[in-house]
């Protein structure tokens, strides 16, 4: 089974040749109120700009640098709120899963299951996610070549699910550093599935602060503009009202919410040029 070249999530279309779509939200689910504030702000912004939005957040960040790092509120607290967000804002929701068992538990509460980069080769994980029937977004491992994603996608489609998104989030470049090779985007597009560029994790410095990861937020727009100029189905951006004081260890690479409007306007302009729209 080949992957679908166009994947629809709610009313959002991901297609390498269609208008740019957005996956955005805070790194971690912090509270019901915070989730409602963020989802409401992003829904209002994207409706005004005319860009499709999938809201993302994580109930658990299982691959933190330190044992003492804040991981999130957990499934019991987050999943009921995901249901509320979908109903209240008519927004599709994406969250990541970390074990095979979580896939079936989480699937009824979201629209997209995300496979973290560190788990992108785990066959049993990919099969379990695929069998839920949900759209699957796979982050390309920092250790994988872009052409290796063909095998990752095949594990999902071979399990009966053609609705796959692939996300580029940088490749390991020495210690505590990632680099984005824009050649990866057309290579991944050749697989046949929509390609997403993760603009915020691509500037991450894994483990760069000793007990947590660092990041170079100032390069988010640079990389996002480059990726959109190449041509992608969507961009993935973690954002927060106050990232430097958030509970997330991804604070250094999250984009302040106030900076989102200007960035999205520029990216949409680049997208129109790249796709001749």
UniProtKB/Swiss-Prot annotation:
Domain of life, per lineage: Bacteria
Gene3D superfamilies, per the entry: Aldolase class I (3.20.20.70)
Subcellular location as annotated: Cytoplasm
GO biological process: keto-3-deoxy-D-manno-octulosonic acid biosynthetic process
Cytoplasm as UniProt keyword: yes
Name of the protein this chain belongs to: 2-dehydro-3-deoxyphosphooctonate aldolase
Enzyme class: transferase
Gene this protein is translated from: kdsA
Pathway terms, separated by semicolons: Carbohydrate biosynthesis; 3-deoxy-D-manno-octulosonate biosynthesis; 3-deoxy-D-manno-octulosonate from D-ribulose 5-phosphate: step 2/3; Bacterial outer membrane biogenesis; lipopolysaccharide biosynthesis
Gene Ontology CC annotation, any one: cytoplasm
Lineage, top ranks: Bacteria, Pseudomonadati, Pseudomonadota, Alphaproteobacteria, Hyphomicrobiales
Metal-binding in keyword set: no
Family: Belongs to the KdsA family.
Keywords annotated in UniProt: Cytoplasm, Lipopolysaccharide biosynthesis, Transferase
GO molecular function terms listed in the Swiss-Prot or TrEMBL record: 3-deoxy-8-phosphooctulonate synthase activity
Catalytic activity reported: D-arabinose 5-phosphate + phosphoenolpyruvate + H2O = 3-deoxy-alpha-D-manno-2-octulosonate-8-phosphate + phosphate
Main location: cytoplasm
EC number(s) from the headed UniProt entry: 2.5.1.55
